[in-house]
């Protein structure tokens, strides 16, 4: 019933262990495992529909740990709550925990080993980090104590949000972003149709940066959840750093 824990469960579980995943898990804009999610009945995270599925266990994220989880527990359904991963290390921990919860510790350990091996290949010595701005709808940015912040750091960039004292997430005025003079501006996937919250991403400042190869869209599904797919974001941002350094 949660986008991120659903993906962890699909990674670790046998097919017959899962009876339903959330509709968001089948949304390719947000889910790196949308195709796999379509194999299962979809739910919308409501206690009534979850109860009718008669699950032996529900796994969900901390952001869902509210009235729905309370109701499920009152109905006698065990619920395991996961904290969202705010770092690459936390991804490893959540995979291992999901393996224990679903009785698949060996499979989880294999996934963690593969994760570690790929991460080691992507970590390159960085003599001088370039500076990146993370900028999203409504002028929202993410700091170093977030998964995306850790991804950017691992790929060899310093996050300008740190200079503004942002550790998790906050609004950043466009003027402050411009004055910071980042080497690159990283944004997320755009939704179909026009959203008022995304208007700021069409500002001439960002469009000019894009024309000069200084603004790049990162697939939201790569980093919005703490799964091994986050390493695809590390790889893409690392390649971007190589391109920028090659032009100097």
Short names for language-model regions:
Residues 1-13, 106-157:
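Basic- and aromatic-lined ligand-binding clefts that recognize polyanionic substrates
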Residues 1-63, 157-160:
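A short, structured surface patch at a secondary-structure boundary
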Residues 5-11, 26-31, 140-144, 187, ...:
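Short, solvent-exposed loop/turn elements at domain surfaces
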Residues 22, 28, 147-169, 214-217:
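His/Asp/Glu-enriched short active-site or ligand-binding loop at hydrolase and phosphoryl-transfer sites
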Residues 36-48, 85, 165-174:
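Short helix-initiation/N-cap motifs at beta->coil->alpha
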Residues 47-54, 75, 171-181:
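Short helices/loops that flank or line small-molecule/ion binding pockets
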Residues 90-100, 109, 184, 188-248:
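Structured C-terminal subdomain patch of bacterial secreted/periplasmic proteins
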């Amino acid at each position: 019933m949660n986008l991120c824990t659903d993906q962890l469960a699909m990674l670790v579980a046998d097919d017959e262990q899962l009876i339903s995943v959330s509709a968001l898990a089948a949304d390719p804009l947000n889910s790196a495992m949308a195709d796999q999610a379509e194999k299962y009945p979809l739910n919308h995270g409501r206690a009534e529909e979850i109860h009718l599925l008669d699950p032996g266990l529900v796994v969900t994220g901390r952001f869902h740990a509210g009235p729905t989880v309370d109701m499920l527990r009152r109905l006698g359904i065990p619920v395991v709550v996961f904290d969202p991963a705010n770092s690459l290390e936390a991804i490893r921990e959540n995979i291992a925990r999901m393996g224990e919860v679903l009785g698949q510790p060996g499979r989880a350990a294999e996934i963690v080993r593969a994760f570690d091996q790929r991460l080691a290949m992507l970590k390159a010595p960085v003599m001088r980090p370039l500076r990146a701005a993370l900028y999203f709808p409504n002028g929202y940015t993410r700091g170093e104590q977030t998964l995306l912040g850790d991804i950017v750091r691992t790929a060899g960039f310093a996050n300008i949000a740190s200079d503004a004292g942002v550790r998790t997430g906050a609004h950043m005025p466009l003027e402050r972003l411009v004055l910071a003079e980042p080497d690159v501006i990283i944004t997320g996937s755009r939704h179909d149709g026009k959203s008022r919250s995304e208007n700021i991403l069409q500002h001439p400042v960002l469009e000019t940066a894009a024309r000069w190869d200084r603004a790049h869209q990162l697939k939201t599904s790569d980093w919005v959840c703490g799964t091994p797919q986050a390493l695809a974001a590390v790889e893409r941002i690392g390649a971007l750093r190589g391109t920028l350094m090659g032009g100097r």
